[in-house]
Amino acid sequence: MDTLSPFAVDRRLGGRVRTWLSAAVCAVSAGVCAVVSGAAWAGAQVEEPLADSVRTALSAAIGRTEPVLVFADAAQRQQCEGWAVSLEAKLLKRKPEELVRREFLQTVCYEAKRAGLEPGLVLGLIQVESGFRKYAISSVGARGYMQIMPFWSRTIGNGDPASLFHMQTNIRFGCVILRHYLDVERGNLFMALGRYNGSRGRAEYPNMVTAAWRGWKL
């Protein structure tokens, strides 16, 4: 079994996946800092050059193209399973098949926590970006649940934009990218969400995501 899972990566790398991202951003800001949505929210996200340290950190956080959901221990599995069960009813209309629904929620919990994000925030972002549609494509080409722009697969992935339609791959990219933007914006969620959507500094998109997030809080 492939052990390069989100929690396994944290173990192998000494729990430094999130630390790498923050440290890399801080290092870049000390020098020269080089730093999507459903049809209604197709952002104008622009590919920006990344410093080598940031690119390396993001690539390490992404890991393999199609990660396997392998929990580090029973407690972590139970935590995400319990969270998923508690929210299944709310997702029933969007994902009527029980196994698909549960796998989706567990994956969101898993990847969000790996990136140091609130799972409910990730659900809110997915709701606004794609309406929970796995194969959503925006007018600017953003793909999947978290509307990942294809250039990210070339910049920090395997170069195959089709892989962004794989559920866990897409959610992992989205969580890692949002974590990166939070680090760039020094923890300012409003600005990070705007950067994610390509509408940095404007209120409408961040307000929609945070409103959707409230609907997923237990």
Regions found by a protein language model. Give the residues of each.
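N-terminal secretory targeting signals
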Residues: 1-89, 93-99, 214-218
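Catalytic glycan-binding domains that act on GlcNAc-containing polysaccharides
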Residues: 59, 66-218
